[in-house]
């Protein structure tokens, strides 16, 4: 995951925190993960595209296109679980994860990873699938913890 670390954004500024004051849910989600909060200038999906391409074929162009669409709606980006995953929160408080194993780590939706991202962009609210190694996540006013061992479907 050196690629992600090398392209990490600067920690979120005080001004950006003030701008997010009316969106406490986004910050609460990220603080639940690791408390490492970044501004959305990190372009997380483009940073992760090299890892994705290695494992799943030449997905770079698709990932970058989704990155451009998603970045317009990003509120904050967090780096979590030993720097391996980007935890992103969009303007509506929705959240999703990208990282080295994106098809498993992203929000679970109907179809492939890119179809899941497309659903996010269309405003479909997806619930996370939590694995035993993930942290508790607060999303849409509900708390999910790994020991619940529940699989949520949209």
Say what each PLM segment does.
Residues 89-93:
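Short acidic-glycine loop/turn motifs at beta-strand connectors
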Residues 82-84, 94, 102-105:
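Short Gly/Pro-enriched loop/turn and capping motifs at secondary-structure junctions
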Residues 99-134:
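Compact, glycine/acidic-enriched structural inserts
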Residues 72, 97-100:
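Secondary-structure boundary/capping motif
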Residues 1-86, 128, 140-154:
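A surface-exposed partner-binding patch
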Residues 136-138:
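Short, highly charged C-terminal tails/helix-capping segments
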């Amino acid at each position: 995951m050196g690629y992600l670390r090398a392209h990490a954004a600067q920690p979120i500024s005080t001004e950006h925190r003030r701008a997010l004051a009316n969106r406490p849910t986004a910050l609460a989600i990220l603080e639940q993960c690791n408390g490492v909060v970044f501004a959305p200038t990190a372009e997380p999906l483009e940073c992760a595209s090299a890892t994705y391409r290695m494992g799943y074929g030449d997905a770079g162009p698709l990932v970058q296109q989704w990155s451009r669409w998603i970045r317009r709606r990003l509120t904050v980006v967090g780096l979590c679980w030993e720097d391996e995953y980007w935890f992103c929160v969009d303007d509506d408080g929705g959240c999703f994860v990208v990282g080295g194993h994106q098809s498993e780590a992203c929000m679970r939706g109907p179809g492939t990873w890119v179809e899941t991202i497309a659903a996010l962009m269309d405003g479909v609210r997806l619930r996370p699938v939590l694995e035993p190694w993930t942290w508790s996540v607060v999303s849409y006013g509900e708390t999910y913890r790994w020991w619940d061992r529940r699989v949520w479907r949209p």
